From Swiss-Prot:
The record's account of how the chain is modified after translation: Under stress conditions, phosphorylated in the C-terminal on many serine and threonine residues. Phosphorylated in vitro by PKA. Phosphorylation enhanced by increased intracellular cAMP levels. Homocysteine induces dephosphorylation. Phosphorylation by SGK1 is cell cycle dependent.
Record's subunit section: Interacts with RAB4A (membrane-bound form); the interaction involves NDRG1 in vesicular recycling of CDH1. Interacts with APOA1, APOA2, PRA1 and RTN1.
Any one GO molecular-function label of the UniProt entry: cadherin binding
GN (gene name): Ndrg1
Chain intervals with Basic and acidic residues compositional bias: 345-371
Location(s), subcellular: Cytoplasm, Cytosol; Cytoplasm, Cytoskeleton, Microtubule organizing center, Centrosome; Nucleus; Cell membrane
Superkingdom in the source lineage: Eukaryota
Lineage: Eukaryota, Metazoa, Chordata, Craniata, Vertebrata
Keyword Cell membrane: yes
Sequence repeat start and end residues: 339-348, 349-358, 359-368
Naturally occurring in which organism (per UniProt): Rattus norvegicus (Rat)
Amino acid composition bias (Polar residues), ranges on this chain: 327-339, 374-386
The protein's name in its UniProt record: Protein NDRG1
Region described as 3 X 10 AA tandem repeats of G-[PST]-R-S-R-S-H-T-S-E: 339-368
Entry GO CC: adherens junction; centrosome; cytoplasm; cytosol; microtubule; nucleus; perinuclear region of cytoplasm; plasma membrane
C-alpha cells in the first residue's frame, strides 16, 4: 500500500558560530576536570565534564585530525538539544597527543603513537577515572581509534557513534600524493579537504574559513603533522560482516554510523556499514549536510543520539525533540523498520577507499523512514532470515 510522505525542512534556530565568536570558547558550564594522564604509550590530555553516575556509562569522545575536543564537539554538546542527554551522562573528552590548546611541540625525534597505540592508551583513561564502560563518539580519525578500542576491549564499550569512519588503510595513491605535496604550505588545505566536501568548501565559506584559521593560528603545526601521519599510516580494521557458523572480527556493541550526504567520507562510511553486523548497526545519512554533522546539524545529531541510547535501555522517558515533533505533526507514519531493508550503495562493487573520492553518488533518501527510529533489534541473532540493519535519512 502506498503512503504519502512529507519532507520537513528543519533549519537551525540560530547560527552555529556567531560572528566574532571563538569556536573554542563555547564550553558549557560543568563540573570540569582537566588532567594529563600517563598511559601505556605516553600522556593524554583528558577533560571530564560532569560526575559519572553509578553504573551508567560515560560518553567518551575522540576528535578528528585538525581539531581537538573543543572545536570538534563543543557546538554539539552546548546545543540545547544535548542538554537532556548530558543531564544523564558524564562526558569524557580525549585530545590526541599534542592536539590540545596550547600544546608544546614534541622534542626532535619523538615517536608519535600509531593509531593502534592511540587506541591502546584509552583503557588507562578509564582506569584513572574509575570508569567501567563508555559510549564512544568519534569523528574521522577519532572514530577509527574508538573502533579499534572497541575491538580490543569489547567489555569496556557499550555503544559507538561513529562519524565519517573509514575502516580501510590509506590508499597508496593518496599516501603518495600527501608525501609529494609536502605539508608546510599545504597543511591547512589538506585538513580542510578532509573535513569538508568540495561543495561545502564553496558554499559554506564562513565556517570553512573559521576552521582554516583555527588550524593556522591555534593548532601546533608540527604536532598536527605527526597526528596526520599516524592517521595516514593506519592499518585496515579487518572487520567482516558476521556469517552463521563462522568466526569473524566485528564490533560486539550497537553502532550508529553517521555521515552527511555531501561529506567526502560517504563511500568509506557505507563500506564500513557493509562490514558490520546488520542486527546491531544503523547508518544515518543526513540530508543537506557536509563533513561535520555535529557542527552543521547538532539538533538532528542530538536526537539521533538520544534514540540510540534509548535503544540501549537508557533515558526511557526522554522527551520528544523538535525533529520528532515536526515529523509527527506532518502526518508521517511511524515504522519499526523490521525485516529486510534495501541498502543503497552497499552492492555496487569495489569502491574507492579514500575520503577524497567525489564520484557520482546516489542521493536517494530512504524516505519510508518517516521518523528517526534507530533502535536496533537487540534480540536478533545471526540465524534470523533477513538482516535488520537500518539506513535512515533525515
Amino acid at each position: 500500500m502506498s503512503r504519502e510522505l512529507h519532507d520537513v525542512d528543519l533549519a537551525e534556530v540560530k547560527p552555529l558560530v556567531e560572528k566574532g565568536e571563538s569556536i573554542t570558547g563555547l564550553l558549557q558550564e560543568f563540573d570540569v576536570q582537566e588532567q594529563d594522564i600517563e598511559t601505556l604509550h605516553g600522556s593524554l590530555h583528558v577533560t571530564l565534564c560532569g560526575t559519572p553516575k553509578g553504573n551508567r556509562p560515560v560518553i567518551l569522545t575522540y576528535h578528528d585530525i585538525g581539531m581537538n575536543h573543543k572545536t570538534c564537539y563543543n557546538p554539539l554538546f552546548n546545543s540545547e538539544d544535548m542538554q537532556e542527554i548530558t543531564q544523564h551522562f558524564a562526558v569524557c573528552h580525549v585530545d590526541a597527543p599534542g592536539q590540545q590548546d596550547g600544546a608544546p611541540s614534541f622534542p626532535v625525534g619523538y615517536m608519535y603513537p600509531s593509531m593502534d597505540q592511540l587506541a591502546e592508551m584509552l583503557p588507562g583513561v578509564l582506569h584513572k577515572f574509575g570508569l567501567k564502560s563508555v559510549i564512544g563518539m568519534g569523528t574521522g580519525a577519532g572514530a577509527y581509534i574508538l573502533t579499534r578500542f572497541a575491538l580490543n576491549n569489547p567489555e569496556m564499550v557499550e555503544g559507538l557513534v561513529l562519524m565519517n569512519v573509514n575502516p580501510c588503510a590509506e590508499g597508496w595513491m593518496d599516501w603518495a600524493a600527501s608525501k609529494i605535496s609536502g605539508w608546510t604550505q599545504a597543511l591547512p588545505d589538506m585538513v580542510v579537504s578532509h573535513l569538508f566536501g568540495k561543495e561545502e568548501i564553496h558554499s559554506n565559506v564562513e565556517v570553512v574559513h573559521t576552521y582554516r584559521q583555527h588550524i593556522l593560528n591555534d593548532m601546533n603545526p608540527s604536532n598536527l603533522h605527526l597526528f596526520i601521519s599516524a592517521y595516514n599510516s593506519r592499518r585496515d580494521l579487518e572487520i567482516e560482516r558476521p556469517m552463521p557458523g563462522t568466526h569473524t572480527v566485528t564490533l560486539q556493541c550497537p553502532a550508529l554510523l553517521v555521515v552527511g550526504d555531501n561529506s567526502p567520507a560517504v563511500d568509506a562510511v557505507v563500506e564500513c556499514n557493509s562490514k558490520l553486523d546488520p542486527t546491531k548497526t544503523t547508518l544515518l545519512k543526513m540530508a543537506d549536510c557536509g563533513g561535520l554533522p555535529q557542527i552543521s546539524q547538532p539538533a538532528k545529531l542530538a536526537e539521533a543520539f538520544k534514540y540510540f541510547v534509548q535503544g540501549m535501555g537508557y533515558m526511557p522517558s526522554a522527551s520528544m525533540t523538535r525533529l520528532m515533533r515536526s515529523r509527527t505533526a506532518s502526518g508521517s507514519s511511524v515504522t519499526s523498520l523490521e525485516g529486510t531493508r534495501s541498502r543503497s550503495h552497499t552492492s555496487e562493487g569495489p569502491r574507492s577507499r579514500s575520503h577524497t573520492s567525489e564520484g557520482s553518488r546516489s542521493r536517494s533518501h530512504t524516505s519510508e523512514d518517516a521518523r528517526l527510529n534507530i533502535t536496533p533489534s537487540s534480540g536478533a541473532t545471526g540465524n534470523n532470515a533477513g538482516p535488520k540493519s537500518m539506513e535512515v535519512s533525515c
